[in-house]
Amino acid sequence: MLGLTEAEKIKICLQKQVNSSFSLHNGFGGNLYATEEKRMFELVKPKAGASVLNQSTWIGFGDSRTDQSNSAFPRSADVSAKTADKFRSLSGGSLMLSMFGPPGKVDYLYQGCGKHKVFYEGVNWSPHAAIDCYRKNWTDIKLNFQKSIYELASQSHCMSLVNALDKTIPLQVTKGVAKNCNNSFLKNPALYTQEVKPLEQICGEENLAFFTLPTQFGTYECKLHLVASCYFIYDSKEVYNKRGCGNYFQVIYDSSGKVVGGLDNRVSPYTGNSGDTPTMQCDMLQLKPGRYSVRSSPRFLLMPERSYCFDMKEKGPVTAVQSIWGKGRESDTAVDQACSSTPGCMLIQKQKPYIGEADDHHGDQEMRELLSGLDYEARCISQSGWVNETSPFTEEYLLPPKFGRCPLAAKEESIPKIPDGLLIPTSGTDTTVTKPKSRIFGIDDLIIGLLFVAIVEAGIGGYLLGSRKESGGGVTKESAEKGFEKIGNDIQILRSSTNIAIEKLNDRISHDEQAIRDLTLEIENARSEALLGELGIIRALLVGNISIGLQESLWELASEITNRAGDLAVEVSPGCWIIDNNICDQSCQNFIFKFNETAPVPTIPPLDTKIDLQSDPFYWGSSLGLAITAAISLAALVISGIAICRTK
């Protein structure tokens, strides 16, 4: 280049832009000044009602409110046609009606498979049904039945009613009926009677019968059966046998002779009440497949003839929907109580009375809204509702049970903020960039760019190092290594400290349910605090990587200017050039520094800064993926801030 006199020199630099409107963001290996900032995540609010994690892996069991074959459908339904198609339903039916088979009631073969099971049935066996059969009020039996169904369903992929058990009954008995059972009797248990003419101490023969619980029913595998062990309860021996010969007993034995259910008044006392009519009690037994025997005192034999079978192959969520009548009909709370006392069961309850559209009892708008989420897939389902947003934080603690990628409770002000808008890098403390060191721009250097930060979902993938595109731009692996090493170490420290705290909390577990709930809440809070800490580390790493990337991008821009200038300009310091005003006039300067004011600055490839936080099942309780992608684009606007400074 020709020598230049002082009078001919013009110094062109990148103008300083930082002022009081900028905020400083510190990061690993580099800092940023920014005109704006935003939280890494916003708080989400759960939607009330039911939803599912996967549309292809759930099944429902219902009645007329989910029955597409009902003549009043869809006005009679509380779900959409799409959701009704997922239900196994029949108007007038219920799982308990099919289990016991009272005379004159709907008897439907409930069966199906799904990881998540939704139960919206039960109202058809309620006080309004007025089922007697030696029992004026069946609510406590219904409660135990529904609870057992929910418990076993939560551990099984498939379930089915077994409506005909193989059995062997004694020759001396015949099918019996009862006046208070519509002159008939239940299909399960079946009543068998023995005609006897009692003499002193002689009351007929003891009944001995057998039934077999199958290992398979049709295509359904049976690892465990729910069996109703029913027996009569007498207030006194005299009520059972007025001549005083013998005591009542009805006992079920397994193949080894062990008692598994029933009542034996030979060893257990009578109630001592003053009633003259027995009542029937039914206990819910969970029995493995096999051959069982039933022994009963003369006169009466109650024989198990049905069961529900479960394959016990897969644990999954259970949702129970409150099943009540509209005005004028008496309901019970058995479904509510059963679900609330069963681990893993989410209860959906109305806040208002049931008001139907098709009639008083079918097509309630509030219930339709609560069940509308069954049309969608959620990221998280819980007792508090369902969430489909990707944010890991919610304002309120989500009540258990909960499944999926559930957000943790956090205060908005505790969520870290990341820089946004106009960004200017500082040189920071990074020493791994080697292009060359004099090229690293400090706080006195300008860059005007647009930063687009998108928070996207990612699967479990461990920690991914930032990568540099072959064509230039982005973060070098070397410049990110120290930051990633630090984030890895800090996260391990956080997790170790949290796990130690959780172990201490475990020592405080007692059998008191409230203490366990309190413990669960404390663990959730510990998880939230740890995640916020990890996000703080991620934010610092992100800021550092963006800062380094911007510095590199600025260096590439400076290199482009130097290359265009050739011998017409001398770079005297990072971002500053001296030219001869007589040799390079305004149009020449426009060509070098403003690219003729026509061609944009070549777009810098996106800054690839991805981080996947791998979830630890013990630590998080569900799979949680975070990915932060930062992209930087420089346009012709970059050059518009260049100022010309004359030096003599």
From Swiss-Prot:
Segments for region (Fusion domain-1): 8-33
InterPro entries, per the entry: Capsid_hemagglutn, Hemagglutn-estrase_core, Hemagglutn-estrase_hemagglutn, Hemagglutn_influenz_A/B, Hemagglutn_stalk_influenz-C
Region (N-acetyl-9-O-acetylneuraminic acid binding): 151-303
Topological domain ranges for the Extracellular compartment: 8-623
EC number annotated for this UniProt entry: 3.1.1.53
GO CC annotation: host cell plasma membrane; membrane; viral envelope; virion membrane
Enzyme category, top tier: hydrolase
Alphabetized GO MF terms: host cell surface receptor binding; sialate 4-O-acetylesterase activity; sialate 9-O-acetylesterase activity
Record PTM: In natural infection, inactive HEF is matured into HEF1 and HEF2 outside the cell by one or more trypsin-like, arginine-specific endoprotease.
This protein's UniProt keywords: Disulfide bond, Fusion of virus membrane with host endosomal membrane, Fusion of virus membrane with host membrane, Glycoprotein, Hemagglutinin, Host cell membrane, Host membrane, Host-virus interaction, Hydrolase, Membrane, Signal, Transmembrane, Transmembrane helix, Viral attachment to host cell, Viral envelope protein, Viral penetration into host cytoplasm, Virion, Virus endocytosis by host, Virus entry into host cell
Region (Esterase domain-1) location: 34-151
Transport found in the keyword field: no
Ranges for region Fusion domain-2: 358-643
Residues bearing attached sugar chains per UniProt: N19, N54, N137, N182, N388, N545, N596
Region: Esterase domain-2, residue numbers: 303-357
Residues at the catalytic site: S64, D359, H362
Residues spanning the membrane: 624-644
Residue intervals annotated with topology Cytoplasmic: 645-648
Cysteine disulfide links: C13-C576, C203-C245, C222-C309, C230-C282
Subcellular location as annotated: Virion membrane; Host cell membrane
Catalytic activity of the protein: N-acetyl-9-O-acetylneuraminate + H2O = N-acetylneuraminate + acetate + H(+); N-acetyl-4-O-acetylneuraminate + H2O = N-acetylneuraminate + acetate + H(+)
Family: Belongs to the influenza viruses hemagglutinin family.
Summary of subunit composition and partner proteins: Homotrimer of disulfide-linked HEF1-HEF2.
General function of this protein: Binds to the N-acetyl-9-O-acetylneuraminic acid residues on the cell surface, bringing about the attachment of the virus particle to the cell. Plays a major role in the determination of host range restriction and virulence. Class I viral fusion protein. Responsible for penetration of the virus into the cell cytoplasm by mediating the fusion of the membrane of the endocytosed virus particle with the endosomal membrane. Low pH in endosomes induce an irreversible conformational change in HEF2, releasing the fusion hydrophobic peptide. Several trimers are required to form a competent fusion pore.
Name under which the protein is recorded: Hemagglutinin-esterase-fusion glycoprotein
Origin species: Influenza C virus (strain C/Yamagata/4/1988)
Lineage of the species this protein comes from: Viruses, Riboviria, Orthornavirae, Negarnaviricota, Polyploviricotina
Gene transcribed to yield this protein: HE
